[in-house]
């Protein structure tokens, strides 16, 4: 990196093209570190955490339609039927006790490890109304939410209404976290990522210009991976051959 920077800075034209690449990358990684925990916990604790979040999240389009006076009856009907179609497959393997425990523990970790200024408003409600007791909060969610059982979910979908959905504690928790993240973290992360990509492209272009005879492998995450050696026949078990 020092060699590259010296090479870029030694020529005015190169400095204009490549001089800011490494300092820009350094700054973008420093900026991204501020959001590393919130992004990780959003992905792992919310998006891939308790299954009740997934069902609530998938109901957002219906919630928007229910709240809008512009929604046509046929559009609303189609969304309701789509939501109903998720019921059987989801609740067939849904274990409420396990999901409730997962819900409480992951929210507790989110609250503990993500910086407080990146907490959604629902965490303030848990701190005040539930005295920071995530198990108590989880019990309230799973005892009352329409997403906690097939019976409650199907009953709601038989006569859906916006007010009931907006008051649902499971739905409110999901909306509070995802909306706050979108407004306060996701846009910043996207902007930093774009900046990071811009500087990385400049850095790679500069490296290729600095070392014209060197071969660079493409990014293995976006292209076919390089492989070495020989591909041979494979017999995983008796009677099976690849």
Set out the residue ranges of the language-model regions.
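Terminal presequence/propeptide segments associated with secretion/organelle targeting
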Residues: 1-242
């Amino acid at each position: 990196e020092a060699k590259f920077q010296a090479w870029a800075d030694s020529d005015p034209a190169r400095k204009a093209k490549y001089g800011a690449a490494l300092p820009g990358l350094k700054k973008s990684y420093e900026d991204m570190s501020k959001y590393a925990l919130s992004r990780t916990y959003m992905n792992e604790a919310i998006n891939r955490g308790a299954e009740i979040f997934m069902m609530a999240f998938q109901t957002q389009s219906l919630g928007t339609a229910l709240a809008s006076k512009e929604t046509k009856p046929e559009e609303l009907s189609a969304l309701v039927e789509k939501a109903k179609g998720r019921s059987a497959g989801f609740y067939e393997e849904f274990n409420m006790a396990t999901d409730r425990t997962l819900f409480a523990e992951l929210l507790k970790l989110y609250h503990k490890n993500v910086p407080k200024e990146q907490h959604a408003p629902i965490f303030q409600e848990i701190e005040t109304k539930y005295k920071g007791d995530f198990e108590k909060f989880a019990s309230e969610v799973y005892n009352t939410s329409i997403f906690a059982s097939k019976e409650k979910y199907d009953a709601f979908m038989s006569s859906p209404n916006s007010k009931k959905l907006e008051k649902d504690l499971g739905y409110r928790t999901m909306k509070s976290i995802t909306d706050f993240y979108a407004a306060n973290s996701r846009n910043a992360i996207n902007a930093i990522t774009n900046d990071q990509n811009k500087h990385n492209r400049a850095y790679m272009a500069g490296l290729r210009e600095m070392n014209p005879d060197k071969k660079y492998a493409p990014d293995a995450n976006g292209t076919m991976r390089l492989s070495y050696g020989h591909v041979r026949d494979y017999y995983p078990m008796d009677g099976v051959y690849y």
